[in-house]
């Protein structure tokens, strides 16, 4: 029978990113349509607005960022162990695009690619990441 890895069964979407051409227009659209609120992320090399889609425990948070050459939606999955998740990705035919990367005081992030060429993120919360 089909066997699903525990990691895949436990992972849940935790973050999304939407490419935009006009950040102010996009903030207005998503704010008006869905009630999302935004906070500009200081220190990012380009515009990066964090979106809050619901109260604590509801919805998932995401971001708007300047559209580059690849205007695609990015989904990030929350996992218990970034190392185990990366191993599972590569062990099942996927690839690592950007390895384990520190987000100081927040956690660890990696960008991967599935067997169909779709990019997605992995995130492990760890407030001691430094």
Where in the sequence are the language-model features?
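Acetyl-CoA-dependent GNAT
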Residues: 64-66, 125-126
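Vicinal oxygen chelate
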Residues: 2-9, 14, 18, 39, ...
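Short, charged/polar, Gly/Pro-enriched secondary-structure boundary elements
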Residues: 56-62, 118-120
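Core segments of cupin and vicinal oxygen chelate
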Residues: 8-11, 17-59
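Short acidic/glycine-enriched loop/turn segments that link adjacent beta-strands
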Residues: 44-47, 69-71, 103-108
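Mid-chain, well-packed structural core segment of small domains
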Residues: 68-96
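Structural motif
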Residues: 13, 59-62, 72-74, 107
């Amino acid at each position: 029978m089909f066997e699903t890895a525990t990691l895949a069964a436990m992972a849940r979407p935790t973050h999304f990113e939407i490419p935009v051409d006009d950040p102010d227009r996009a903030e207005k659209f998503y704010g008006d349509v869905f009630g999302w609120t935004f906070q500009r992320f200081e220190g990012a090399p380009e515009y990066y607005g964090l979106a809050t889609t619901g109260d604590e425990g509801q919805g998932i948070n995401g971001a708007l960022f300047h559209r580059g050459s690849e205007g695609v939606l990015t989904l990030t999955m929350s996992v218990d162990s970034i190392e185990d998740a990366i191993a599972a990705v590569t062990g099942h035919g996927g690839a690592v695009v950007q390895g384990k990367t520190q987000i100081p005081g927040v956690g660890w992030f990696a960008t991967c690619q599935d067997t169909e060429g779709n990019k997605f993120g992995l995130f492990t919360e760890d407030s001691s990441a430094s």
